[in-house]
């Protein structure tokens, strides 16, 4: 069993978060995603933004964004009530005001946002992963159909009506998925600027989609 589940909490960015077997253990790649999202928001949108985190799990992304961008309004969704219980406990623990929504992807979302961020399940069912992950962490949060691309297409094909005109969509991705996700993004947002960025191991790990933002900094 992973030590984080035994201890019951984990440090993420500046927060300490509760974790159990209903949520994925937050990875440092996801800390890096949050770091980049914060930078892009501050430089291109300003701090009074509305953010939606899809598939929030422990709440690590949503809570850190709220912590670092205190003027933002942050909503976070998950299909798992057990995950939302953990996320709510983390909001309470860190005194952060995030609105949690039970929703299968975008189904129960009613607002519009400047930023949509997601670290969805992206492992293909036939991909080999480490036993400690496969045997302990929630498969609901790990695996996805369509070679791991299912959630990216679901989000991108439906996102437009939940976005304000000027917006950023940010994803964590599997290292071989960058060009496929870029292709899907341009299918639904043909005028967007799409950036694929690498993690600390020099692997494709993040996709950022910018709409109506001309001079991206």
Provide a role label for each language-model segment.
Residues 213-217:
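Flexible, glycine-/basic-rich loop-and-beta segments that form/coincide
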Residues 25-28, 56, 74, 78, ...:
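Residues at secondary-structure transition points
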């Amino acid at each position: 069993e992973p030590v984080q589940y035994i201890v019951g909490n984990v440090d993420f960015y500046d927060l300490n978060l509760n974790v159990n077997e209903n949520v994925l253990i937050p990875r440092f790649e996801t800390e890096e995603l949050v770091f980049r999202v914060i930078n892009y928001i501050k430089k291109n949108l300003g701090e009074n933004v509305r953010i939606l985190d899809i598939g929030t799990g422990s709440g690590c992304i949503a809570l850190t964004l709220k912590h670092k961008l205190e003027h933002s309004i942050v909503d976070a969704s998950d299909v798992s009530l057990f995950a939302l219980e953990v996320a709510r406990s983390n909001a309470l623990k860190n005194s952060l005001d995030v609105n949690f929504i039970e929703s299968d992807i975008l189904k129960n979302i009613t607002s519009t946002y400047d930023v949509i961020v997601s670290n969805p399940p992206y492992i293909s069912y036939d991909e080999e992963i480490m036993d400690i992950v496969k045997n302990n962490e929630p498969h609901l949060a790990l695996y996805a159909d369509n070679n791991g691309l299912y959630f990216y297409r679901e989000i991108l094909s439906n996102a437009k009506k939940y976005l304000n005109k000027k917006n950023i969509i940010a994803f964590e991705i599997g290292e071989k998925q960058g060009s496929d996700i870029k292709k899907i993004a341009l299918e639904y947002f043909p005028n967007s600027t799409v950036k694929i960025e690498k993690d600390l191991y020099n692997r494709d790990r993040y996709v950022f989609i910018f709409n109506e933002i001309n001079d991206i900094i």
